[in-house]
Amino acid sequence: MNPEYDYLFKLLLIGDSGVGKSCLLLRFADDTYTESYISTIGVDFKIRTIELDGKTIKLQIWDTAGQERFRTITSSYYRGAHGIIVVYDVTDRESYANVKQWLQEIDRYASENVNKLLVGNKSDLTTKKVVDNTTAKEFADSLGIPFLETSAKNATNVEQAFMTMAAEIKKRMGPGAASGGERPNLKIDSTPVKPAGGGCC
């Protein structure tokens, strides 16, 4: 057992391009935000260690690094994930409609008992909102997964989203399943990607 942490959880952020996945990651891991974030900057993952119920949990949070623009993310990305956060943009109805497709990807590639969380991002853009909170909540409830609206821009519920996911995974794994000793093989893809403009509130 590594003395630095009790658990190591691999989390994934998936969803359509431009919904703010990278901004959520930067807000949670570094507490930073930028309007001019390049969607394909190629951040593979960030790490943040949290305390939960007296346990030290190391979260390894993976971003799609722009792959989602091609609608398919390689199956290896899902391998070994403990939790997957599906993100849509509350001002973009299509990104919400595509949540079902992302959930199908999870069913196809991720482990059967992986924890899921639905996140509606950009909640600060209240005047542009087109996806109703109640609609999304009912959909998430029907699937038995937690749901939160977040804003990476003003940090609303960002901490809560990742803490909720960590708590759900910890609950599923039980007290005897500390994964601190498991070392997932890290394969960092260094393929250069073409930057594309666009912010991600």
Swiss-Prot record:
The keyword GTP-binding applies. GO terms for biological process: autophagy; Golgi organization; protein transport. Regulated by guanine nucleotide exchange factors (GEFs) which promote the exchange of bound GDP for free GTP. Regulated by GTPase activating proteins (GAPs) including TBC1D20 which increases the GTP hydrolysis activity. Inhibited by GDP dissociation inhibitors (GDIs). A motif (Switch 2) lies at residues 65-80. The keyword Lipoprotein applies. GTP binds at residues 17-23, 33-36, 39-40, 66, 121-122, 124, 151-153. The modification N-acetylmethionine is found at residue 1. Mg(2+) binds at residues 22, 40, 63. The modification Cysteine methyl ester is found at residue 201. Gene3D superfamilies: P-loop containing nucleotide triphosphate hydrolases (3.40.50.300). Interacts with MICAL1 and MICAL2. Interacts (in GTP-bound form) with MICALCL, MICAL1 and MILCAL3. Interacts with GDI1; the interaction requires the GDP-bound state. Interacts with CHM/REP1; the interaction requires the GDP-bound form and is necessary for prenylation by GGTase II. Interacts with RabGAP TBC1D20. Interacts (in GDP-bound form) with lipid phosphatase MTMR6 (via GRAM domain); the interaction regulates MTMR6 recruitment to the endoplasmic reticulum-Golgi intermediate compartment. Interacts (in GDP-bound form) with lipid phosphatase MTMR7. Switch 1, switch 2 and the interswitch regions are characteristic of Rab GTPases and mediate the interactions with Rab downstream effectors. The switch regions undergo conformational changes upon nucleotide binding which drives interaction with specific sets of effector proteins, with most effectors only binding to GTP-bound Rab. Rab-1B binds GTP and GDP and possesses intrinsic GTPase activity. This is Ras-related protein Rab-1B. It comes from Macaca fascicularis (Crab-eating macaque).
